[in-house]
């Protein structure tokens, strides 16, 4: 193991919600159709906030976004604001009237097909955790498609969490993403044009997400070992950003996510009776019409860890680097058109140039 270990300071920023929305769809039963799915959250930012409304289709297909629902967000003071449909079932709540504030409870109302669906009020937590990401280079054993064990180089992140001494029980969730560049092959041309890079953002982490709670009997400091284990590849030949989203959540939201986590780690599906059903906080008057999902009020903090090529002991030839001895068709397809890669954009994310 390489002894290098780098500490990354934690700081709070308002979350860019379009990049961290999570829908938590889980192994939908192919025989269940036309069941409403409602997910979303409000955080302490100025908005907008996003709600997702969809119908299950069965046949293992993802839920189909609904365009004609009426979505309203409310706070405990009675203020309310309508949310506008954007695309594919995603609704945007501008935050002009209802704005996320710590300690305040929020809920949504969704009207669809003459049915009213209401979320139970969820209160935004006051307490935040202090989290510190640290990484080290490592060697891990993977198994090839031929069944042969292979030693490969990786970068492993630990997460050190501490919570202030305060009364009550506090609940947290962590999710991780990564962003990196992919550069297309710079084939010779008479104008000397250099193709712009693509920016890939995708989920990472050893698990779908991490959950912890703290009470007066538990330690206020915890280390999550190997929260991220990432094999080295060509994406580390340039700047590589790892992102941690920390959510302080309510007990109800924690219980919901715990069910989701259990289900994703088992062979059950979202609709297996009775233990396979995940109980969210979406309610309706008609007991024969049910919806799945959760609308939560969460405190969000985000931190970034940047890895540069000169910080790691990893070398590999860039497979997209132009080589006159290689025919055009011998390059990987993404070397000619990187936008075809999943999660790829030509524009860098807002944090790319500011995080160093």
PLM features: residue spans?
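Short, Lys/Arg-enriched N-terminal segments with co-localized hydrophobic residues
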Residues: 1-3
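Sec-dependent signal peptide recognition
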Residues: 5-11
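A periodicity- and composition-biased signal for non-globular, repetitive helical segments
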Residues: 11-13, 283
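C-terminal motif of bacterial Sec signal peptides marking the signal peptidase cleavage site
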Residues: 16-19
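A sequence/structural signal for flexible, mid-protein segments enriched
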Residues: 21-356
């Amino acid at each position: 193991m390489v002894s290098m270990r780098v500490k990354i300071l934690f700081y709070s920023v308002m979350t860019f919600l379009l990049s961290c929305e999570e829908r938590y769809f889980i192994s939908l039963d192919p025989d269940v159709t036309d069941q409403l799915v409602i997910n979303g959250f409000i955080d302490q930012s100025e908005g907008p906030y996003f709600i997702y409304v969809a119908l299950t289709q069965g046949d293992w297909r993802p839920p189909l976004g609904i365009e004609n629902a009426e979505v309203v967000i409310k706070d405990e003071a009675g203020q309310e604001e309508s949310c506008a449909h954007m695309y594919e079932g995603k609704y945007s709540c501008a935050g002009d009237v209802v704005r996320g504030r710590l300690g305040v409870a929020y809920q949504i109302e969704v009207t669809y097909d003459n049915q009213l669906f209401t979320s139970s009020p969820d209160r935004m937590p006051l307490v935040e955790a202090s989290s510190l990401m640290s990484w080290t280079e490592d060697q891990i054993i993977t198994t090839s498609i031929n069944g042969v064990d292979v030693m490969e180089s990786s970068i492993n992140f630990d997460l050190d969490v501490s919570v202030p001494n305060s009364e009550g029980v506090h609940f947290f969730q962590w999710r991780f993403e990564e962003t990196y560049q992919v550069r297309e092959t710079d084939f010779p041309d008479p104008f000397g044009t250099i193709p712009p890079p693509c920016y890939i953002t995708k989920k990472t982490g050893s698990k779908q997400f991490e959950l912890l709670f703290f009470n007066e009997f538990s330690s206020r400091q915890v280390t999550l070992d190997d929260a991220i284990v990432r094999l080295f590849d060509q994406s580390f030949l340039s700047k590589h950003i790892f992102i941690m989203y920390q959510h302080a959540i309510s007990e109800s939201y924690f219980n919901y996510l715990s069910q989701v986590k259990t289900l994703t780690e088992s062979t059950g599906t979202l609709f297996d009776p009775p233990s396979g059903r995940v109980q969210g906080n979406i309610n309706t008057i008609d007991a024969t019409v049910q919806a799945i999902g959760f609308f939560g009020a969460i405190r969000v903090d985000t931190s970034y860890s940047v890895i540069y090529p000169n910080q790691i002991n990893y070398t590999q030839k860039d497979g997209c680097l132009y080589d006159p001895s290689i025919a055009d068709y011998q390059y990987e397809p993404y070397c000619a058109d990187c936008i075809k890669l999943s999660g790829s954009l030509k524009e860098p994310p807002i944090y790319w140039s500011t995080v160093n």
